């Protein structure tokens, strides 16, 4: 059985992953190497978004446990109208903002708060 590759570690305690499809295909996203932060593997994201591809155009995406932002940025890359990312770790939220700026992600909102509190 093959084992999923873990994202490569890069400088400054950051790791990277790639966006699989859409307008940002093959672009790299950086995220902090934090305990418990495990991005959704490429193969899982590819399968999920292949299923959802006809449903994404114009939808508003809410990612409650954003982490690396992989799921949300993938959705925005593939045609979602807007994206709201909630990440309770303030350092990772800053990293998500940097990635959104790098991608010129219009319609992306990043909130640094606990999703359970935000949902109340």
Set out the residue ranges of the language-model regions.
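Class I S-adenosyl-L-methionine-dependent methyltransferase catalytic core
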Residues: 1-120
């Amino acid at each position: 059985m093959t084992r999923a590759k873990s994202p490569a570690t890069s400088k400054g305690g950051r790791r990277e992953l790639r966006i699989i499809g859409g307008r940002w295909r093959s672009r790299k996203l950086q995220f902090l190497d934090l305990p418990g932060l495990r991005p959704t593997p490429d193969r899982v994201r590819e399968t999920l978004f292949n299923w959802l591809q006809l449903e994404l155009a114009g939808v508003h995406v809410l990612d409650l446990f954003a982490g690396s932002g992989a799921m949300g940025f993938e959705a925005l890359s593939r045609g979602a109208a807007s994206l709201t990312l909630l990440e309770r770790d303030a350092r990772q939220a800053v990293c998500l903002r940097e990635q959104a700026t790098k991608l010129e992600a219009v319609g992306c909102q990043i909130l640094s708060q606990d999703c359970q509190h935000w949902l109340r």
